[in-house]
C-alpha cells in the first residue's frame, strides 16, 4: 500500500474502519502505516506484522 490509498483498519472490538494512508514506514518486522480516520483526521499509526496474519491491521479497501 502507498500514500493516499483507501484502506480499512482493524480496531479492538468493533467493525473495520475506513481511512486513508498518510505515510508508510518499512521495518524488518513489518510496516507502519499512518492512517487518517474520521475521528483521527491527523492520523494514527498502525503496524502490520510481517508473516503473521493476526498481526495485520491495515488492509487495502475494495
Swiss-Prot record:
Belongs to the DsrB family. It comes from Escherichia coli (strain K12). It comes from the Bacteria. Coiled coil: none annotated. This is Protein DsrB. Pfam families: DSRB (PF10781). Transmembrane segments: none annotated. NCBIfam families: PRK10708.1. Induction: Expression is dependent on RpoS.
Amino acid at each position: 500500500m502507498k500514500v493516499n490509498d483507501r484502506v480499512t483498519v482493524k480496531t479492538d472490538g468493533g467493525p473495520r474502519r475506513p481511512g486513508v494512508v498518510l505515510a508508510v514506514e518499512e521495518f524488518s518486522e513489518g510496516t507502519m502505516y499512518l492512517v487518517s480516520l474520521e475521528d483521527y483526521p491527523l492520523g494514527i499509526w498502525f503496524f502490520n506484522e510481517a508473516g503473521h496474519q493476526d498481526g495485520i491491521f491495515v488492509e487495502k479497501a475494495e
